[in-house]
Each structure stands twice: as structure tokens, then as C-alpha cells.
Amino acid sequence: MSSGHPSDNEEPRADLLREEEEEEEEEEDSDEDRGSTRPASPQATRECAGTQGSSRPEVTADGGTGSASGSGCRGSGACDSLFSWICRRKIRRGPYVDPARDHFRTMTRLYSSMSPAADSVNLSTQTHGAVFNLEYSPDGSVLTVACEQTEVLLFDPVSSRHIKTLVEAHEDCVNNIRFLDNRLFATCSDDTTIALWDLRKLNSKVCSLHGHASWVKNIEYDTHTRLLVTSGFDGNVITWDTNRFTEDGCPHKKFFHTRYLMRMRLTPDCSKMLISTSSGYLLILHDLDLTQSLEVGSYRILRARRPPLSTEGSSAGSRSGGPRHTIDNKNHPHREGLSPRNSLEVLTPEIPGERDRGNCITSLQLHPKGWATLLRCSSNMDDQEWTCVYEFQEGAPPRPPVSPRCSLRLTHYIEEANVGRGYIKELCFSPDGRLICSPYGYGVRLLAFDENCAELVDCMPVRTAQLREVRSIYSHSDVVLTSKFSPTHCQFASGCLSGRVALYQPHF
């Protein structure tokens, strides 16, 4: 003990007092709010008493023990700060315990090293035709391939082993595949039908669904209501009640209709439906209720409301999001009593370099956390293509104040290779939403929001920014039409016009 203590018989009591004070410091450190400035501990407050007015206070005497050096105070503060950080991590508070944040540097290195696997799947052009769509099962155990020549192929994506070929799965091109769960999946085709399949019994369809009058291009699934949702070039969005399907089909009804329909998607929480059109419009149904059919032909009452022009350049223009169409209840009083469910918003998304020219939204995807939408657009002259990311300005994590007039804001974009005209290129998000895989000529590009592959909410630009290229891989001999990330493995796949499917894995 130091000479400052009156006698040796008081040493145990002094030790107990110090231990109690240290325990109180630990409790206060563990209870502090995440992200706030850590308040000084009681001991530090006493040590720094009388010097609060100084920007860098020195430690004063404490209990007659004599003055300590300023470096001692700073060292104690550093130790306290380190202890507080460890304590917060231990009790799983703060951003330090998010696995995605902990491992994003590792994932960046992994995806930067992606290369075609030596045992990629090669398909015969004469037998299968072009690859139009790829889809993994939710558990990542099966990769399905939608082919031009009426067939669906199933592979083990880890070993590239062929599992099954669904010969004549349809009578025309197979356009899209969607898993309802780990065993049941649906396919759609230009033969205007949808087919349900069970992985446990692939010798025959579970059932065929008839209801569309033209090519069926898109399948979605509402996990809450177990409704299958399909869209086609007949302009119809149809819901199918899979709770009551039989060998003859299942009950269905027409939910929505619009002209020039290209793609339809549901947000991950199924609270919104997004529909893209070949005329450049993007339709958003908010507060979605799939059990209520919308009136066909009632959308002539929509009128355009263009936001005021801004003088802040492209940044402000991107915040406005372009023209917005809303229901004019003053001119149509019978619409005032409408339920707020399924409220419709019609947007003309801003496309870089295409302010005065039309465009076609050919591909549509949603961020896995519902924060943004991903569009592949082409000019009306079909001489330019872009990949664009639009942030949802409602329901997303808090961002700096933006214009409330539009629910989408262009945040990132990049120009694409203008090859394979007339074919739709399907792009996709990675499961964590940090990367985009985009068909690019005879290969694919991995794109990120910044050089660190950060999450969108962590690198939201004030002005519209270009997507960063993480890696380009050219492994096909023809135009790539589709790409897909595995939901469980560090792997993605791409398919091209000549019928080849390539698998990509990290190469060390």
C-alpha cells in the first residue's frame, strides 16, 4: 500500500471500496446507449474535478494520494474505452456484432477472386436452346435451368452433377422458375401456362394452371397467404390459391391489368407490388392486399404530376425520381371512399442520359431487405442499356431528408454493353444485398455500391453515383442472358444464348 493510507489495518477496507467502485464502473459502461458518447465514470469524475473548464483536464489529487500525471488519465480513459467496447461486444450490442459487418472484408476478397468452376455445366444448343432463367432452391441444394426448347434441367450446384431433365415441361419456351419452398416449384412458359412440380416426384407435374391469354413471363409467391402471383404479356396479373390446388389446377382470379407489362415483383415482406412496362413506367401498389381484385380499366383517371425542376443538377433531379402519377379524387369523387389498401403510384424512373427520350424497363429485381429496386433499362432506340438502383424513400432505414413527392430515388447507375438486342438480361442481388451480378456482353460483372462492398444504407450518396465494378468475368462464347446468386454458398451462375451455364466460385 502507498504511504498515503493512515495504517495497515485499513488496507482490506480500502481494497473492498476500490473493488466496489470498479464494479459500479463496469455496470455503468455496460448500460450506456449504443452510439452515444460514453459518460465519465465516477472515479474519473472525481479525478478530473476542478479542471472541467479545460479542454484537456489534468488529473488532480484523489483522497490525499498525491497528484497523478496527465498521461495516466489518458491511459485510464483508453483502458476504459477498450473495456467498454469489449463489454458491448460481449453482450451483443452495437454494430460490432453484426456478422455481415464483421465479415464484409472477407466476402469482398472472396467475390473478387471468383472464377469459373472447372466443372461448369455445358448444355447442348441443339437440344436445349438458350438459357432464359436460373433459380436456386431456398436451401441451395438444387439449381434449376429454364431453357428455350421447352425443357427444365436440374443440377447439384456443388458437384455440377445432373439430377434430372424435365423433357417437354412445356410446349414452348420456359421463361421463369420460382420455388415456393424447398420441394415445390413453379415454371411458366410462352405456351400461356404455369406448371407446379415437386422435387420428390419429378416424373409428372403436380398440376397445370390455365388463365393467361399470352406468354407468361414472371412468377412470384406470397408466403403469408400462399398465393402464387403470375404476370404475362397479356397485361394481366393473376393470383392462384395454392392452398386448394388439385390435379386440375387451383382457384384463380385476375388481380390487376395494365398495358405493356414486362415484369412484376413483390417486395420481400409482400407489402408492395412493382410492375415495369415497356413504355418506361414503373407501377407501385402500396399496402398490398392480394385478396382484393382491382378494377380493370379504371386507371384512365390517373394524371401526371411532374415535380418542379431543381437547380441543384443531377443530384436534385435524382431525388425527385421523375414524373409521378396520382389519383385525382377531386375530379373523381367516387374514388374518395377507397380503402388505402392497394393504393397505386405510377412513376417514370429517371434514366441517366435519357431525360428527353423514352426507355423500356426490361428487368426488375428487389433488394433482399426491401431497401431498393434494381432495374435494367434500354433506350427506345435500343442502342443503350443501363443498370439503375432506386432507393425506397419510405420503409427504408432513416436517410437524410429528401423530397417526399416520390417514393423512389435514383442512387446508383452504370451503363451496360449494348449487345444481344431484343433479349432480356436478368440481373440479381447477392443474398446480403451488397453485390449485383449483371450480364455484360459475353460475361458478367460484379457491381458494388462502393469500393468496400458496403451495404447500401452505409454508403448512400448525396448525389447519384456510379456503381463500382468489383470483377468482370468473361467465360461464355455468346451473349449472357441471366445470372443468379446461390442463397447459401459463395457461388453464382450465369446462362447464355448458346445454352451454356457457368458456375463461379472463389479461386485461391
UniProtKB/Swiss-Prot annotation:
Keywords: Repeat, Ubl conjugation pathway, WD repeat. Belongs to the WD repeat DCAF10 family. GO terms for cellular component: Cul4-RING E3 ubiquitin ligase complex. Pfam families: WD40. The gene is dcaf10. Signal peptide: none annotated. The keyword Repeat applies. InterPro entries: DCA10, WD40/YVTN_repeat-like_dom_sf, WD40_repeat_dom_sf, WD40_rpt. Residues 18-32 have a biased composition (Acidic residues). Pathway: Protein modification; protein ubiquitination. It comes from the Eukaryota. This is DDB1- and CUL4-associated factor 10.
